[in-house]
Amino acid sequence: MALKSKLVSLLFLIATLSSTFAASFSDSDSDSDLLNELVSLRSTSESGVIHLDDHGISKFLTSASTPRPYSLLVFFDATQLHSKNELRLQELRREFGIVSASFLANNNGSEGTKLFFCEIEFSKSQSSFQLFGVNALPHIRLVSPSISNLRDESGQMDQSDYSRLAESMAEFVEQRTKLKVGPIQRPPLLSKPQIGIIVALIVIATPFIIKRVLKGETILHDTRLWLSGAIFIYFFSVAGTMHNIIRKMPMFLQDRNDPNKLVFFYQGSGMQLGAEGFAVGFLYTVVGLLLAFVTNVLVRVKNITAQRLIMLLALFISFWAVKKVVYLDNWKTGYGIHPYWPSSWR
């Protein structure tokens, strides 16, 4: 009886060990299958970024047992928000693809299968957005092998982590995953065929260009070009165009009280709209052109009466333009500009 009991215990132990080993091999095979499928999906993308949907998130994250043999860096995108330039979604997605391609090019061995770059599009994967708890874009998150709760925001990339675009993203990846991204490999601005065509055109056009330069018949010899260029630069400089470009200021705003009304002038010294800058630039340009006309053209008019009338008209228009600029400055800043007349005039 004792022998029979020992035999039963031995058989039970063998069965337990067999099932354990079978489960272990099964998990190993499952992980290997997931890795192979991720590698296959990555190979179909030019930049190595895998397009995932709700089914892919379920397969590679929620249904896969932890710890997973890979990490996923996920870029959350929404095509309907691409028109909002302040979000910079298209630019960040392009830089994200550059980091992915650089990582893939610099890690051809086993290190290349430890991290995969993925993207999720809102219109096709709304459930995944809810699963991750993403309610604002841009959003980039690293899902490490041990993460089981996808709402864990410990792997979220801060705005400072993509301030320098691809370079900052690469630093984030290297810091969090301990993997080496390697040098960022940006695509050239021009392909080799394009460079060849440009060089051929330059070689063909060089003799004709030299001939026209020697004869003084190029566009650079036209004084009207330089005059137009000077006016163009003057207008955009006094209009504060560089300020608007650097700060990405809109041309106008929508009135909060009346959505059908547009605001072209913003009251406050800390902000200038594009239309407002162009209006001020136009007034300054009018004064500058009148001054140039008076000092270079009007002095050649032989009729004294005509000279005086045109001079008075130019002074009146200039005074009106400067008055409008001063009024706008007073309205925006609250600081008044008052004339000080000589005491003998009072």
From Swiss-Prot:
GO cellular component, one term: oligosaccharyltransferase complex
Annotated TM spans: 190-210, 226-246, 278-298, 309-329
Gene3D superfamilies per record: Glutaredoxin (3.40.30.10)
Glycan attachment positions: N108
BP GO annotations: pollen tube reception; protein N-linked glycosylation
InterPro entries with a match to the protein in the record: OligosaccharylTrfase_OST3/OST6 (IPR021149)
Lumenal side: 23-189, 247-277, 330-346
Residues of the signal peptide: 1-22
Topological domain ranges for the Cytoplasmic compartment: 211-225, 299-308
Protein localization: Endoplasmic reticulum membrane
Subunit structure: Component of the oligosaccharyltransferase (OST) complex.
Function: Subunit of the oligosaccharyl transferase (OST) complex that catalyzes the initial transfer of a defined glycan (Glc(3)Man(9)GlcNAc(2) in eukaryotes) from the lipid carrier dolichol-pyrophosphate to an asparagine residue within an Asn-X-Ser/Thr consensus motif in nascent polypeptide chains, the first step in protein N-glycosylation. N-glycosylation occurs cotranslationally and the complex associates with the Sec61 complex at the channel-forming translocon complex that mediates protein translocation across the endoplasmic reticulum (ER). All subunits are required for a maximal enzyme activity.
Protein name in UniProt: Probable dolichyl-diphosphooligosaccharide--protein glycosyltransferase subunit 3B
